[in-house]
Amino acid sequence: LDGTSGLSENLSLGEISPIECWNAGLKALEEGHDAAEIFLKELVWREFAYHLAHHTPRILDNNWRQEWNNFPWNTNDKDEKVILWQQGRTGIPFVDAAMRELYVTGRMHNRGRMIVASFLTKHLMTHWKIGLKWFENCLIDWDPASNAMGWQWSAGSGPDATPYFRVFNPNTQLEKFDGKYEYRNRWLAEFSGKNSKNALSFFDAIPKKWKLTPEMEYPAPVVDLSQGRVAALDAYKNREF
């Protein structure tokens, strides 16, 4: 899950300008660097978020597509499954690895963000604003516009959102992007034991009230992925707009 520019926090803090990144990306593209095209597309996506936040500021804290206001998402941020999602204890390795990395480092790869957002809003049928608020508390590259658009893209309530029937399977995604389980083992002590300082650092970073230790067994999944997908699709298909 490497291969990012690592500039997201610099952009969010104003330490580097989008136009400077754009010019550097164009130069790299002209020099034949294939990844430059992806970089430029992501930069445009970021600026699109700011465009939307300026012209339709409701995207920052409300459904951009207002017909989603009556969708039956869970809105209880104290829900047990929500807390397990926050703690990286869902029993779904890709989700948990990404959430623990987030808590320790304040960072998360874009692929991880898509997976954990899809899982929360679709498999757990939880309102995207709960996830957005947790990201706001944890990310060092927190960007109101980009994150609001990203969460609403995953949930289906935003502009140019992912189709409602696109529900990421975290286990399939793990096999595709982390086939050797290097990322999983880097962040989940239950799989790596005491061989990963990164995984163990999570238990030093978390609040004591969570009462989690590296010796604990890895939890069972909070939801069956197949059943969760079917339930989400049924809810999306039967939504009343």
Which residues make up each language-model segment?
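C-terminal catalytic domain of photolyase/cryptochrome flavoproteins
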Residues: 1-241
